[in-house]
């Protein structure tokens, strides 16, 4: 019988529900249990694909091409599993499906309501995950905060699941904040008490309360929370700010959270073997070198917009025993005149993915600086496209060369739409999305990084390199070092006369893991260390 764990949040959002869920998933997996994890988001968008990164952080892409919440990145990195489109459910998806069924006549003329139709659809998404994966445990994180009007159907659905499958097969974890009032020198449990009261008014009694805090939580405070929230003091789990996120599973294990979960769910499993994870955390906390990477983007004021890129850089750093210091460089403030001053202290330059025409010239200036001054450069998606534009302008001398996405009337459309994309009007879900193979050219830096000539990577883009310019580019020294297996689509370019200048059309950051860094990131950080 599959067991179900639901993680809710109270008091404030962005409290760490995703990290808690991912960390618990890691512990349970290391106890020999099969784990699947999913995120329910109460917003009405079908997915975050068309949302501004300022609104929602990065869009995380799964193997099957789903554009999902960034928490799925945490899940994949912590638990080391590959999720799919069923792992992220939104209000928009659920309502779309229910309306589609109503139009088909599936409800036999009945009045379609939030209860039971919306809640049944939500429950089906949970049970579908169990059917498709046959996992021992399904962990479902409910986005938002208890008390939000948008969350009510989700909370009602997970309340009903307890009746559907039995109390011994369901566990509720509530994550709350214990704020520290600096002026009073006190921590306050009242917000947690009120949040649990709100949750209980909706019919859900949490079995475990995870309290986020900056300061240690005393036993007296745990006893107080337990008394008012009707749980044992041992079921109040402290989650303090950590030096590294990857220490959270060890902190939860130390407080026996996984034991409490298994006892409640009436499961038996051996203790989690966490030696490798402990070694990883020890390594992360004791890095002996430092390397500075300039990350040039237009959303740098919200670092979550580049969360997976930053994590992949850190993973590569762990492998090189190096702490990654990221310079978050706003491309809107970079010009040809000031780029040398801005970049003078960086050991490597990375231009990540992005859309739209704002701040493009700042990125191109950074790429030119990296190429001319032999600074290691790594371009991802748009960072690859602009590398070819910069080369066309400044090496081939093609004046006004650009991407047709940015400048539709350009004479030299180095980057252009594929023919099959030209008549598409909708923005959502129409990109080249998900895992695709790429064939690597022998004797290139890309092959040196991967150690093989055939790889699979995740994509998220609409525009492609224009093959009309391929021969010109290669004759001038830009190597096309990877293509789609049929040779039609350019996947990686690099420079022959540069220590390390590699740019890829795909998003390699999505497959990086803390104990298994992605190959291009690993070699990029190595090149940056050599450039110190």
Curated annotation (Swiss-Prot):
Q: In which pathway does it act?
A: Pyrimidine metabolism; CTP biosynthesis via de novo pathway; CTP from UDP: step 2/2
Which CDD domains would you find in this protein's record?
Answer: CTPS_N (cd03113), GATase1_CTP_Synthase (cd01746)
**Catalytic residue positions:** 381, 507, 509
What EC number(s) are associated with this protein in UniProt? 6.3.4.2
**Transmembrane residue ranges:** none
Q: Where along the chain is UTP bound?
A: 13, 188-193, 224
Q: Where does CTP bind?
A: 13, 148-150, 188-193, 224
Q: Glutamine amidotransferase type-1 domain location, by residue?
A: 292-532
Q: Give the record's keywords alphabetically.
A: ATP-binding, Glutamine amidotransferase, Ligase, Magnesium, Metal-binding, Nucleotide-binding, Pyrimidine biosynthesis
Residue numbers spanned by region Amidoligase domain = 1-267
| Membership in a protein family | Belongs to the CTP synthase family.
Role summary: Catalyzes the ATP-dependent amination of UTP to CTP with either L-glutamine or ammonia as the source of nitrogen. Regulates intracellular CTP levels through interactions with the four ribonucleotide triphosphates.
* Protein's recorded name: CTP synthase
| UniProt organism field | Listeria monocytogenes serotype 4b (strain F2365)
Q: What is the lineage of its organism?
A: Bacteria, Bacillati, Bacillota, Bacilli, Bacillales
| Gene from which this protein is expressed | pyrG
